């Protein structure tokens, strides 16, 4: 039997009213009836609070990492709270511009930016392009020489050689990675010199990102020291220290908060003699625990002495993290939040994959049944953004809740949406 629901995993405005969970003043069961399932539900006050924390912690220099969760409404919320935003593809850039996000507050990332993406970014007037390779420098030089585009304000992405102590698929700071210029080989120094000497680029600073779901502040401090020591001799004033702050997903996990993370990064850089702007790119730390996903149970299969399967109407197409990273999640019944969670279940999706598991081992009240709405918390990051149409399953809608009101910000995908691209 599991203990009571760990409330630190829930959105900030979560309350129990007559045994039912209410977020943003909205009953989750009623939201499931109104919008259907699966559905992503975001606590808008939680989102704004984390944006405000990041802005305060980094002195207004925080940049939201759009890849964690991006839609027009989220881009506008980020803008209204005074953060910049980092985008890493032409699609993310287009979404930001469509939302009316000021281009000079955008940072354009990507390890393999195409010429068309670079043209789009430069013509839009993005604030910074984070240069990731010598091939990218060649492309920028070419666009300047042949089309007169530029010069471009750039940050040089370096690979500091830091172990982030996280899953190998989201570790990016070690030497063996596709990202950036490696410090240990001298490539980082070479890249900075080239950028400073090139007429097509204005070298503004250095960027590093060591990975995602990082809980050890010392890993961040180590990266910050390396970035600072590389930047200072070249007179580069801006330091962008990436994102990656971990968040708890299951009971028993804990993580530093945004203020503690900022203190570690900024304090380290100041101690090294950095006097210029220090930026960071929180994504998951802002959106992950702001949301939960509601599903409806369709089938219960009990194998005596083995396990009980709860099959729901979503799965790996709306949350691929368990399949990709072995990520764990909690589960609960919004209609019975305070009830003892005495029945162990494995929550699976509707896809034709044995690995389509959302929760490998979760606990629910013993009376869970077909038709019940269940919820998985901490799904605000890399669920909607990494979702797919696997097996032609339509993508779920996204709903923002605040002050007792709900609003649809991304509608449920329909079959007709998938047919629109077909030309055969």
Task: Report the location of each language-model feature.
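Active-site beta-loop-alpha junctions enriched in small/polar residues
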Residues: 46, 67-71, 88-91, 111-113, ...
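Active-site loop/helix belt of alpha/beta enzymes
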Residues: 2-3, 9, 143, 160-301, ...
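Structural preference for beta-strand elements that scaffold enzyme active sites
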Residues: 61-63, 82-84, 103-107, 128, ...
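Short glycine-/acidic-enriched loop or helix-start segments at secondary-structure transitions
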Residues: 74-75, 96-97, 118, 140-141, ...
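General structural feature for long, well-ordered alpha-helical segments within catalytic domains
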Residues: 27, 31, 43-46, 50, ...
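Charged (often Lys/Glu-rich) extended helix/loop segments that serve as interaction or gating elements
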Residues: 275-424
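A charged N-terminal "starter" segment
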Residues: 1-153, 189, 193-203, 404-424
């Amino acid at each position: 039997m599991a203990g009571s629901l760990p409330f630190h995993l829930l959105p900030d405005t979560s309350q129990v009213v007559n045994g039912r969970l209410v977020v943003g003043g909205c009953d989750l069961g009623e939201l499931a009836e109104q919008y259907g399932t699966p559905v992503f539900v975001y606590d808008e006050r939680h989102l704004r609070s984390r944006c405000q924390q990041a802005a305060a912690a980094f002195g207004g220099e925080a940049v939201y990492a759009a890849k964690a969760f991006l839609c027009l409404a989220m881009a506008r919320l980020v803008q209204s709270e005074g953060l910049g935003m980092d985008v890493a593809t032409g699609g993310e850039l287009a979404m930001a511009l469509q939302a009316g996000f000021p281009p000079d507050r955008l940072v354009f990332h990507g390890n393999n930016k195409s010429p068309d993406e670079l043209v789009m970014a430069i013509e839009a007037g993005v604030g910074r392009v984070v240069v990731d390779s010598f091939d990218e420098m060649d492309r920028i030089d070419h666009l300047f020489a042949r089309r007169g585009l530029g010069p471009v304000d750039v940050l040089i992405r370096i690979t500091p050689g830091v172990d982030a102590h996280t899953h190998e698929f989201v570790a990016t700071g070690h030497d063996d990675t596709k990202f950036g210029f490696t410090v240990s080989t001298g490539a980082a120094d070479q890249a900075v010199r080239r950028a400073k000497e090139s007429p097509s680029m204005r070298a503004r600073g250095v960027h590093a990102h060591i990975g995602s779901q990082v809980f050890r502040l010392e890993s961040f401090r180590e990266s910050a020291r390396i970035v600072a020591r590389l930047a200072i001799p070249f007179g580069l004033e801006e330091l962008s220290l990436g994102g990656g702050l971990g968040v708890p997903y299951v009971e028993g996990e804990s993580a530093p908060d945004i203020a503690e993370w900022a203190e570690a990064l900024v304090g380290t850089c100041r101690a090294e003699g950095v006097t210029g702007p220090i930026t960071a790119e929180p994504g998951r730390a802002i959106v992950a625990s702001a949301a939960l996903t509601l599903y409806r149970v369709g089938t219960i299969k009990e194998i005596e002495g083995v396990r009980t399967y709860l099959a729901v109407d979503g799965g790996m197409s709306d949350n691929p993290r368990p399949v990709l990273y072995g990520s764990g999640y909690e589960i609960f019944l919004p209609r019975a939040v305070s009830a003892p969670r005495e029945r162990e279940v494995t929550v699976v999706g509707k896809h034709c994959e044995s690995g389509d598991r959302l929760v490998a081992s979760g606990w629910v009240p013993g009376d869970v049944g077909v038709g019940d709405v269940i919820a998985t918390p901490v799904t605000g990051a890399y669920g909607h953004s990494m979702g797919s149409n696997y097996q032609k399953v339509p993508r779920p809608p996204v709903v923002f809740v605040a002050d007792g009101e709900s609003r649809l910000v991304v509608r449920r995908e329909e079959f007709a949406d998938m047919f629109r691209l077909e030309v055969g």
